[in-house]
A protein has these predicted regions:
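Conserved acetyl-CoA-binding loop of GNAT-fold acetyltransferases
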Residues: 27-34, 98
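Conserved short beta-strand elements that form part of the metal-binding/catalytic scaffold
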Residues: 32-73
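Vicinal oxygen chelate
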Residues: 14-20, 78-98
């Protein structure tokens, strides 16, 4: 049985415009930086450690988007919160069988 997630946990983006992204998400969502190093930053607007993360491709892949490394800009991944571990597992089993 597939169970709908309870909430969107976080979104991770790959960017070459780190400062602009941090400024924009700070202004629009009231997000604050929880942790930052030269290659990445984690932002939150509530009690979670992070709701947004940004990977700075100008640090990770300074030569550009090599098709072999697939370091393109955009969404890296989404994470979801499920009501329980059992609900997550049941959804996994259901999706795996499709």
């Amino acid at each position: 049985m597939t169970v709908a997630p309870k909430a969107l946990a976080h979104v991770v983006y790959r960017t070459r415009r780190m400062a602009e992204m941090l400024d924009w998400y700070g202004a629009v969502f009231g997000a604050r930086v929880q942790h930052q190093n030269p290659a990445m930053a984690f932002l939150t607007f509530d009690d979670e450690h992070h709701r947004f993360a940004f990977l700075d491709l100008s640090v990770i892949d300074p030569e550009g988007s090599d098709p072999e490394t697939k370091c393109w800009t955009g969404v890296d991944h989404l994470a979801w919160t499920y009501p329980s571990l059992k609900d997550l597992f049941d959804t996994y089993v259901s999706c795996k069988s499709r």
